[in-house]
C-alpha cells in the first residue's frame, strides 16, 4: 500500500544515469535506508543515499524510458511505498 507522497527535490541527468533526490514525509522516512528498497509510483528501486528525510536513487536510461519516472520534474509528487522488511525490523525493536 502507499505510505505517502514523496516530492522530487533534485534531478541530475548524468551521461549514463539520472540521480533523483526525493523528500519523504516523516513517518515513512524512518524506514528508508541506504541500499534498501523503495517503490515510487509502482517502480521498485534501490536507495542510494539518505540524509534526514531526503533520499536519492540512481536510474538507468532503460528505466527512465519505460516508466513514468523518466518524465518527472523537480516538484513533482510520487506515490511512496517503503520496504516492508524495514517495518518488521522496527516493530521487532519496539517490542523488545
Annotate each language-model stretch with its function.
Residues 1-96:
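Conserved loop->alpha-helix
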Amino acid at each position: 500500500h502507499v505510505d505517502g507522497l514523496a516530492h522530487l527535490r533534485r534531478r541530475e541527468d548524468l551521461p549514463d544515469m539520472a540521480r533523483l533526490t526525493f523528500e519523504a514525509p516523516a513517518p515513512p522516512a524512518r524506514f528508508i535506508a541506504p541500499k534498501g528498497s523503495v517503490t515510487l509510483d509502482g517502480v521498485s528501486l534501490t536507495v542510494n543515499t539518505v540524509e534526514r528525510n531526503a533520499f536519492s536513487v540512481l536510474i538507468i536510461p532503460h528505466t527512465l524510458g519505460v516508466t513514468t519516472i523518466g518524465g518527472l520534474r523537480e516538484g513533482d509528487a510520487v506515490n511512496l511505498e517503503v520496504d516492508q522488511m524495514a517495518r518488521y525490523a522496527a516493530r521487532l525493536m519496539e517490542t523488545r
